[in-house]
A protein has these predicted regions:
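An N-cap/entry alpha-helix motif that binds or orients negatively charged groups
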Residues: 1-71, 179-236, 372-374, 380-390
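Glycine- and other small-residue-rich loops at beta-strand/loop junctions that grip anionic moieties
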Residues: 31, 85, 89, 109-110, ...
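Short beta->alpha linker loops
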Residues: 33-34, 111-115, 136, 258, ...
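Alpha/beta catalytic cores of nucleotide-metabolism and tRNA/nucleoside-modifying enzymes
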Residues: 1-50, 292-310, 314-390
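Short beta-strand segments
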Residues: 80-81, 131-133, 157-161
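A gly/proline- and charged-residue-enriched helix-loop-helix capping module
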Residues: 102-123, 127-141
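Glycine-rich active-site/cofactor-binding loop and its immediate structural neighborhood
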Residues: 73-112
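Alpha/beta enzyme core
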Residues: 98, 123, 139-309, 317-321, ...
Length: 390
C-alpha cells in the first residue's frame, strides 16, 4: 500500500507534502499574513460548531450531488484559485484540473498560475473557472478575459481583496520566486527532494505563463515579478464588475467578501455569486474567519444570490458546517495543494476522495440522506448567533 493509500485525512497528505515539496513552496501554501491570526482562526473557528446527531433514520440512497451556478457537481465544492500551483508539483494546475474534472467539480485557474489558460484548456475536456486580478494594464486584462472566453471558461472569479499585497513573512524570509533562485540553501534542499527536482526538469512550465507573453520587456524573472508587483490596481471599484462582466459575457463570481454591505454592493453591481473569503488569511491579518461572518452575509443576501465560501476547510465535516450555515458550496485550495504536493494528480484525487468519504459518513451520522437538505437544523444553535457571528 502506497503512502497516498494510507492517507486517511488531509493532515496526512499535508505531512507527505511537507517531505516532498521544497520549503519555500510548502510554506507558501501553509502560511498566512503577518502573525497568522486570521489564517489560524479560519481553521479554529470551525471547531466551535457542533453537529446534532440523529439516529434511527433510513440512510439508504444517500446523495452528495448538488449544483454550483446551475451546473451539476458531484460534491458542492470547487477547487479554489491558488497562485504558483505549478511550483508545488510540476504542471500542477494541469494535474489539479484533471483530478477535478474526473471528480466532477469545477477547477479554478489563478491569474498567477504557472500553467496558462491555454495549457489547462489543452489538457482538459470540460470548461473550468478562471480567477482574475484587476491590474492597471487594462490591455492585459482585456486579453486575459478574451483568452478565458476563447478557452470556454464557464465562470470568471473576480478577486477584490488584493489591491495591495498582504505582508507575508514566510514568503519574504524564504525569498519566494517562480522559478526558484538557485541559492546554496535551495540547491542543498534539492539534494533531499530529487523527485520534485526531476519533475521540474521535465517541464518548461516554470514561470507565470498567463503573464509572460504579454510583458515584452520582461527579459528575466526579476523584471516579470517587478511588473506584476506594480500592476495591482489601487483604484479598483465596484463599477469595474460591469465592464468585466460585459466583456466576458458569462457568470462573474466576486471573491473576497467579508462584510454584508460589500456583499450587497457586489450584487448591486452585477455579481452572479459571491465568495465569503479572507484570501486564506493571506491578506488582512486580524480580519475575522470566513466561517464567522458567513451567517450574517447569508442572512443579508443569501436569498438574492449564491453564497460560496472559502478559508479553513480541511475536511468533509468542515464542508457540512459551512453548508449548515447557509453556504451553497465551498472553494478548497489547500486541500488541493496538500494533495498535489503529496502525490501529483493522484494526490489531488486522493484528497478529494477523503473529503467525499468524510462528508458522506458525517452526513449519515447526522441523520441526513441528501446534502441539499443540510441546514441550521443540523447544528446546535447555541454555538453561534446568526446576526453577530459566534
Amino acid at each position: 500500500m502506497s503512502a497516498l493509500d494510507r492517507a486517511l485525512t488531509i493532515e496526512d497528505l499535508k505531512r507527505i507534502a511537507r517531505r516532498r515539496v521544497p520549503r519555500q513552496f510548502f510554506d507558501y501554501i501553509d502560511s498566512g499574513a503577518y502573525t497568522e491570526q486570521t489564517y489560524n482562526a479560519n481553521e479554529a473557528d470551525f471547531k466551535k460548531i457542533t453537529f446534532r446527531q440523529r439516529v434511527a433514520v433510513n440512510l439508504e440512497n444517500r446523495n452528495l450531488g448538488s449544483t454550483l451556478l446551475g451546473q451539476p457537481v458531484s460534491l458542492p465544492i470547487a477547487i479554489a484559485p491558488v497562485g504558483s500551483t505549478g511550483m508545488t508539483d510540476a504542471d500542477g494546475e494541469i494535474k489539479a484540473a484533471r483530478a477535478a474534472e474526473k471528480f466532477g467539480i469545477p477547477f479554478t485557474l489563478s491569474t498567477m498560475g504557472i500553467c496558462s489558460i491555454e495549457d489547462v484548456a489543452e489538457n482538459t475536456t470540460k470548461p473550468f473557472w478562471f480567477q482574475l486580478y484587476v491590474m492597471k494594464d487594462r490591455d492585459f486584462i482585456y486579453r486575459l478575459i478574451d483568452r478565458a472566453k476563447a478557452a470556454r471558461c464557464s465562470a470568471l472569479v473576480l478577486t477584490m481583496d488584493l489591491q495591495i499585497l498582504g505582508q507575508r513573512h514566510k514568503d519574504l524570509r524564504n525569498g519566494l520566486s517562480a522559478p526558484p533562485k538557485f541559492t546554496p540553501r535551495f540547491v542543498a534542499e534539492m539534494a533531499m527532494k530529487p523527485g520534485w527536482a526531476m519533475r521540474m526538469l521535465g517541464t518548461n512550465r516554470r514561470t507565470f505563463r498567463n503573464i509572460a507573453g504579454h510583458v515584452s520587456d520582461a527579459v528575466n524573472l526579476a523584471s516579470l515579478t517587478e511588473w506584476t508587483r506594480t500592476q495591482f490596481d489601487l483604484t479598483l471599484n465596484w463599477q469595474d464588475i460591469a465592464w468585466i462582466k460585459k466583456r466576458f459575457d458569462g457568470p462573474v463570481i466576486v471573491k473576497g467578501i467579508l462584510d454584508k454591505d460589500d456583499a450587497q454592493l457586489a450584487i448591486d453591481n452585477g455579481a452572479d455569486a459571491i465568495v465569503v473569503s479572507n484570501h486564506g488569511g493571506r491578506q488582512l491579518d486580524g480580519a475575522p474567519s470566513s466561517i464567522r461572518v458567513l451567517p450574517e452575509i447569508v442572512d443579508a443576501v443569501g436569498h438574492k444570490t449564491e453564497v460560496l465560501m472559502d478559508g479553513g476547510i480541511r475536511s468533509g465535516q468542515d464542508l457540512l458546517k459551512a453548508l449548515a450555515l447557509g453556504a451553497k458550496g465551498a472553494l478548497v485550495g489547500r486541500i488541493m495543494a496538500f494533495g498535489l504536493g503529496a502525490g501529483g494528480e493522484a494526490g489531488v484525487a486522493r484528497a478529494l476522495e477523503i473529503v467525499r468519504k468524510e462528508t458522506d459518513t458525517s452526513m449519515a451520522l447526522m441523520g441526513e440522506r441528501d446534502i441539499r437538505n443540510i441546514g441550521l437544523h443540523n447544528i446546535y444553535s447555541n454555538d453561534l448567533d446568526r446576526r453577530q457571528g459566534y
